[in-house]
Amino acid sequence: MSNLMYNKMWHQTQEALNSLLDKEFQKMSEPQANKVLVFQMLATFYINYVQIFRNMENVYDQIVHPQKRMLIRKVLDGVMGRILELKNEMVELEMTEFHYFDDILQDLKLSPQQLDVPIPRYFLKERLEVIKGREKILARILTECGLNLPVKYAAKSIALEEAVKLIQIAERARQGRLRALFMKQIFLQECRAKEMKLLGHRLLDTKLAALQIQKVWRGFHQCKKTVKEREEEMVFLGMKPSPLFNEVSDAIVQSKQVTNLRDEVQLKHEQDYQEALVNIKEDLKMLEGPDIKEHLQDQIRQWFIECRNLTGTFPDYPNEEDGGSALIFSNKTPEQVMGDIIATQEEEEKLKKKKKKEDKENKGKKGKKEKKEKKEKKVSLKEKAMKDEDEEWKMSPSLFLQLMEEGNSLYKDIWLNKDESWNFPQDYDPELIKEEKRKELEMEIRVQVDELMRQELKNLKLAVNREMEIPPRQKKGKKEQTIVFPREVFGNPRVALVSLHIRALWGISYLSFNNGTIESLYQELVEKGLLIQALKVNLSDYIGEYSYLGTTLRQVAIEPMPSLLDVRQLITLYGILPLGSAEVHERAPLVKSLLLAGPSGVGKKMLVHAICTETGANLFNLSALNIAGKYPGKTGLQMMIHLVFKVARQLQPSVVWIQDTEKTFYKKVPQAEKRFEPKRLKRYLPKLLKLLKPDDRILIVGTTHRPFDAELQPFCRVYQKIILVPRPDYASRYGKFHEVLWKEIILRNGGKLTNSLNISCLSKVTDGFTQGQIVQVIKDVLTERRLRQQAHKPLTAIEFITMMTNMNPVYREEEESFKNWYAKTPLGKKRVLSLTVGNKEKEKDKGKKGKRGKKKK
């Protein structure tokens, strides 16, 4: 698309955002008590914001104007954060992580695919050089250590007699095949000789021969034509995809080329813009700097004279902390400025007196308050739930609405009615840069002018009033205790503070950590196997389909199992979006830890690697088996955690992965695993979570296939969000035209889909099998030899089904055990409680209606 088209798309998206903000501000002022209506309102806002986010992300990725992109980025981060806030509101309202919008999508006339939250492409594009450089360093360290060498499979040693027998069997089989082929050829020759003897006395008629050839040819031609017509009819009726469905069209190839060209233009315009910022500021400093300085001095001198004429004395010059001479030019009279300065001084004195009185009063009241708070906390969960039902619901304050409103107002002021007919290539606008840099230059010059005018005011007071300025008294305070460490210990002051905090929490009395640069620490972690290379897996490779019966099942009081697409959405919302954007991570509801629980083979490990791939994050492996034998002892463990989180903070975003995390929280450690000390991290994980702040883009991700083996309370205390990853449902295994499991994986491994391969039968038969098992079966069937045979021997369903017989599916009992375990988690308990309260209220309403009916009779 052209620049004009993307500009038009941006204007339409801004209009939609403007109307949505108006609606949201209106709804926020109207408290509601009905939870169903509240959820529908939140879900509608959520879906509308997702549509705006999809369009805005596309515009930001393709638009080439550097100044427009800055504004779009601001709005984009605001929309992204607002989506996370609305998701958090829906979770607190429904007490579940999974929501279904079937009815709302139908009302808005949207398809389920339009509900998919995209991953912004700028997460990787703007950090591409950093990510590539880090990958090169990691690859170099791995090659030096010999950790990335291909796995050499050792040959199985067998006895000499067995080897001779194997060779003899193979040789005899080869000779047998040759003998059988030779005998077959002799038999065919004899058959041909017999036919020739029988037909030898008859002369062949040329007309009969021609008719015979025509008959065979016409039959073959008509059969081929019928097959072609049948395929065309199936495509027309929508019962079969078009033959061009899996082929990449020329239009798509051309659009990719245009996209790459736009990326180059975008980069060039950004470089020109950065150069223009420096050049234009220098030009303004040379041309307008002296005039601005002279104008400011004249204004301040005029203020001196006006204040002396009104009050009889020269005024006190405002301090730099209060804004300096900026206070003078805030459209106020000299009397108002003097009044403000005096008022602030009086307020400071009053606050000091109040604090002293409050400190004395609070000492006696502390004990009484603590007793009252303990009594108030002893309210049962059921009473709280009933109170929440009766109270009116109000939306919690948003930190992103103001950001979006600022971006929207800037768009209206600058870009809405701006004439850009002169700017066809969409380069930077120099006038906007001049306005911005003129303000910066004025602030810089004002600081210099303030120093000069303060001295001038002193001289005036000495000359006219004979006054000596009394220097302000320095406030006496407690001396801060400073601890000096060697520079090599903590290069970054922020990391030093964090390290000191860790030492205080864990009671470390001395420094035993490996001191050095981040590069050396990075290399040490790689060599120890704690920092690993993430696999190149995109989140879109986690194939799944939308759950079309979610709302219907919940209306009948049946809790549906989430679909794979629902899991993918949660990974995007809780893992990828906050890690990818620092602005969103600082303001959005903070998610420090994430747990993926589900049977073996459902793709938990793949999702962890997808988070790292989509955000360019480092991957640290602190699994119980991986850290076994490394950094032994208590001090060694503290040193390891310190190193991991120091590097993770410096090179954020980072993901700390704990595979088989139930081992860290075992109820009872198995005898075979006691030597690995799997519970080493159990004590330290809650403390680490407390140290993570909003500006630390670090996510702790745990994966488990046996969560019921762990102690529930400490397990749920560490993991803030728990996502249940299910086995694929029928919609995910089979679909008509969407990317679904069987079709997509067969095509990826070189297979061809034909009429002889019944995908529907495969999807039905493989109910209960996981994605990992399906992938393994397809790889086992589609060998190199089988791929070469596809031209004359198409794939059939029976080939895959026979391979499936050797595998065990996820049985209903195992799935129910995961559901029962999830119902014991904090969010699961709240969900069960809210459902029971809702059912009781429905029964009460039915009873009231029945009594009314009897009275009428």
From Swiss-Prot:
One of its GO terms (molecular function) is ATP binding. Residues 206-235 form the IQ domain. Residues 376-387 have a biased composition (Basic and acidic residues). Pfam families: AAA. Its main location: cytoplasm. Residues 348-388, 834-857 are annotated as: Disordered. The keyword Nucleotide-binding applies. Residues 365-375, 847-857 have a biased composition (Basic residues). Keywords: ATP-binding, Cell projection, Cilium, Cytoplasm, Cytoskeleton, Flagellum, Nucleotide-binding. It is found in: Cytoplasm, Cytoskeleton, Flagellum axoneme. One of its GO terms (cellular component) is cytoplasm. The keyword Nucleotide-binding applies. ATP binds at G598, P599, S600, G601, V602, G603, K604, K605. Component of the nexin-dynein regulatory complex (N-DRC), a key regulator of ciliary/flagellar motility which maintains the alignment and integrity of the distal axoneme and regulates microtubule sliding in motile axonemes. Belongs to the AAA ATPase family. DRC11 subfamily. Component of the nexin-dynein regulatory complex (N-DRC). This is Dynein regulatory complex protein 11. It comes from Mus musculus.
